[in-house]
Regions:
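A short, hydrophobic beta-strand/beta-hairpin element that forms part of a small beta-sheet core
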Residues: 75, 118-135
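Solvent-exposed, acidic/flexible segments
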Residues: 64-71, 142, 146
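Structured, soluble extracytoplasmic/luminal domains of envelope-associated proteins
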Residues: 76-122
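Hydrophobic membrane-insertion alpha-helices, especially the h-region
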Residues: 2-26
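Thiol-/selenol-based redox modules, centered on thioredoxin-like
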Residues: 130, 134-163
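Short active-site neighborhood of thiol/selenol oxidoreductases, capturing the structured segment around
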Residues: 50-65, 75
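Short acidic, S/G/P-rich loop/turn micro-motifs used as interaction or catalytic elements
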Residues: 61-67, 98-99, 137-138
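Alpha-helical transmembrane signal-anchor/signal-peptide segments
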Residues: 27-44
Length: 163
């Protein structure tokens, strides 16, 4: 085999060997940097296609318990914490009765069986549910969950701006 042919084969095989070695020796990190959990199923709701890049949806149960009240009380603070990104993100409460409006939120009367009650969901501009955030009864823990959601949304907004 000629010298250029050896170089060609070597340059072709080297990345394959490095990739295979990286997989076998666990050089690739297993964890992700997001704070929410990826949904294990694909769920797309065209009703949630709004004029914003992202939507934060809260799945309100039929009977609003203490956990639900804590999450509902902290939603306006979450919207305020978005700061300059407020125009890029919508807040939506799913299954909210009409007699209890919340500042800066929209109401969508959807019953989605796959969604867990009291969870926050991050929905993209096509209506695809991407991440879920577990609820908390304690206000301090709810704030920590929302801080993680804010970090995720800011990262996503930054990435979408660069593409």
């Amino acid at each position: 085999m000629s010298k250029p042919g050896v170089w060609f084969v070597g340059l072709f095989l080297l990345p394959i060997i490095v990739a295979f070695t990286a997989l076998k020796l666990d050089w690739i990190p297993n964890e992700t940097t997001n704070h929410g959990a990826f949904l294990e199923f694909e769920l797309r709701q065209p009703e949630l296609v709004l004029d914003t890049e992202w939507t934060i949806a809260f799945q309100r149960p039929q009977q609003c318990d203490e956990q639900c009240q804590t999450m509902l009380q902290s939603l306006p603070n979450l919207y305020t914490a978005l700061g300059k990104n407020q125009h890029k993100v919508s807040l939506v409460v799913l299954q909210q009765p009409a007699d209890a409006p919340i500042k800066n939120t929209q109401t969508v009367n959807l019953e989605i069986a796959k969604l867990k009650d009291n969870y926050l969901y991050l929905v993209d501009k096509t209506g695809l549910f991407v991440l879920e955030y577990a609820p908390s009864v304690k206000l301090d823990e709810a704030r920590e969950v929302q801080k993680g959601l804010l970090k995720d949304i800011k990262k996503l907004l930054n990435y979408s701006r660069s593409s």
